[in-house]
Amino acid sequence: MSAQDFLVELGTEELPPKTLVSLADAFLAGIEKGLAGAGLTYSAKQVYAAPRRLAVLITALATQQPDRSVNLDGPPRQAAFDADGNPTQAALGFAKKCGVDLSEIDQSGPKLRYSQTILGKPTTSLLPTIVEDSLNDLPIAKRMRWGARKEEFVRPTQWLVMLFGDQVVDCTILAQSAGRHSRGHRFHHPEDVRISSPAGYLSDLRAANVLADFNERRQIISKRVEELASQQEGTAIVPPSLLDEVAGLVEWPVPLVCSFEERFLDVPQEALITTMQDNQKYFCLLDADGKLLPRFITVANIESKDPAQIIAGNEKVVRPRLTDAEFFFKQDKKQKLETFNDRLKNVVFQAQLGSVFDKAERVSKLAAYIAPRIGGDAQRAARAGLLSKCDLSSEMVGEFPEMQGIAGYYYAKADGEAEDVALALNEQYMPRGAGAELPTTLTGAAVAIADKLDTLVGIFGIGMLPTGSKDPYALRRAALGILRILIEKKLDLNLVETVKFAVTQFGAKVKPAGLAEQVLEFIFDRLRARYEDEGVEVAVYLSVRALQPASALDFDQRVQAVQAFRKLPQAAALAAVNKRVSNLLSKAEGSIAQTVEPKYFDNANEFSLYSAIQQADHAVQPMAAERQYSESLARLAMLREPVDAFFEAVMVNAEDANVRANRYALLARLRGLFLGVADISLLG
C-alpha cells in the first residue's frame, strides 16, 4: 500500500507558554488515536510547538484504509424458516437489518450469516475529522471566542496548514481554511511562508527565523545561557520549569547578559531570584560561593541590530521589581521579628484550632519536647518554634509568598538570634517536596517535626480527615515529611509518646479519645506507601508493623534487616516454620510456660533445638541491644537445620501433657527470637 507524509500546523495568537508542551503532546496523542481508530498505519511521528503554532508530522502515512470484512450472525436456521421452508419474521428482519435481500444472506450454516467487504476510504477524506477531533479534545481549562465567530479555542486561530504529500487537504477547521502557507517570525519574516512539503516543514520555517521544534529551542537556550554564564565567571540557575516556559515564549531565542545595581545584593538573594524568575523570566547568575551576581540573562525573541537597546530595556524593567524587594526588606527590619507575632493573633490558622499565633505556641512547646529526645537543645527549639510563623505577617512574605521561612531566617539573623534558631525558621518547611532537602540542624528538625505533627493532630482532632483525592491541609505530605526527617537523619524519636504529648497541647479544641492512635496509624500507613514506592514488598512492611515499633527509625532498620533476610537461602523455610509455629501456639490450650524444662525432653532433636536456641539467644541479645537486626536475623537463620530436624522427628502434640506443654514452651522461645526483629511468619 502506498504512503505519503502528512503535516498539520495550526497557527494561533501567542499560546500560554506554561501549557505549550502539554497542548502539543495532547494534539499528537489525539491524532494518533484517530489514525489508530481508522486503521491507518505510519512509520514515524513528530510534534512541534512554538508560541504561535502547534504542528504534527506523520511520516509514511497510508494513503487509504485497508478493506475489511464484516460478518454478522443472524437467527438459527430452524428459527429462520418454518416447516414449509418459508422465511420467518426473524429471517426477514435480519435481512432488513443488513440492508439486503434475503437471497444475499448465507443460509448454509447453523445460523444465517451476512458477510460484507467494506472498502477502505481515502486517507484525505478522514484526516479533517481526525484533526478536528484532536483539537476539540485538547486539555484546555478555558476556551475563548474571538470576533463574531462561534468557534472556541485556547487562543484565536490565524492560519491552517494541512498537507498530505504535496497536496493540500481541503477542509476548514476552527474558522481557518487549510492551505500550504504558514507564517514566519513576527518581525524578522512577517510574510507568509510556503511549505514545500511535510518533510521540509522545519527547514522552511527556519529560513523564516522560526524554530518550530520546542526541544531544539530549549537546547539552544540552555547551551547559550551556560556559555554566557561562564563568560561572566558564574553559574546560571536554570530551573527546568523556567527553561520550558522561556522556550515557550520565543520562536528565535537570543540570550543576552544584563546587569543591575550592586546595592540590591544587600536584599536576601532568594527574594531577588524569585522576582527575576517569576516575574521577568530571567536566568540568575551565582558566583563560585553560591552568591548572587549583579547580572542576569534574558532571552530575546529577536536578533537585534542593536542588542544594547534590548539589554537597557530589560535593566530598566527589572529595577522597580528589585526596588520593591529592597523596600519590603528594609521596612520589615525596622522592627524585631518577634513583634510580628502580634499580627498573627488575628490571623486564623483554622477556625476550630485558633490563630496562627496559637499554632506557633503549640509548635514551640512540642519542639521543646522533641529536641532533647533527638539530641537537640530544648530552649533553642522552643525559641525557634515561637518565631516560626512571624515572617508570615511581614511585608516581604506578603509580596513574595515563596520567601516564607527564608525571610524569617534573615530577620532572625539581623536580630542576633542563634544560628540554628535562625536556620530552623526556614528548615521548618523542609522537606518541601519529594526528594527535597532536609533540615541540617537538630533545632530545625525538631521544629519541622513539631509543625507537621501539630497540623496532623489538629486536623485529625476536628475530624477533617483526607479523602481519596482531597487533602487540603497536605496531611499526607506532612506525614511523609516527618518520616523522611526521622529515617534519613537517623533520629530515634518515640512517635507514640510524642503524638500523645501533641494531643495534650490542644486541650478542649479536639476530641482526644483515640486521636493519638488514629494519627499514628495514618503516619505508619504513609510509611507503607513509601516502602511500596521503593519496591519493598508489602509482606516485609507487615512483618515489622505487627510489632508496632514506636520509632520510625527503628521501623526502617527492621525493614532493611528483613529485606536482607529474604535473600538468604534459609529465609523461605524459616518463614514457613514461623507460620507453622504461630498456628500451633495459637491453638495451645491455656497459657504457655515461660521456661523450658529439659527434663521433659524425650528426643535427641529436642535437646539439639534447645541447645541451638540457647546459643542463638546468647548471640543475638547484644545485637538486639545495638539494633543490629540484619546480623541478628543472619544468626537466627542458622537455626534452620535443628528446626527442620525437630519437626521431622518430634510430634509437638504429645499425649503426655507435660511433654506437650514443654514443647510449646520451646517453640514459643523459638518464635520469640524472631519476633525480636519482625514477625517472619507473615513472609510466607
UniProtKB/Swiss-Prot annotation:
Signal peptide: none annotated. Its EC number is 6.1.1.14. GO terms for biological process: arginyl-tRNA aminoacylation; glycyl-tRNA aminoacylation. It catalyses: tRNA(Gly) + glycine + ATP = glycyl-tRNA(Gly) + AMP + diphosphate. It comes from the Bacteria. Belongs to the class-II aminoacyl-tRNA synthetase family. This is Glycine--tRNA ligase beta subunit. It comes from Pseudomonas syringae pv. tomato (strain ATCC BAA-871 / DC3000). The gene is glyS.
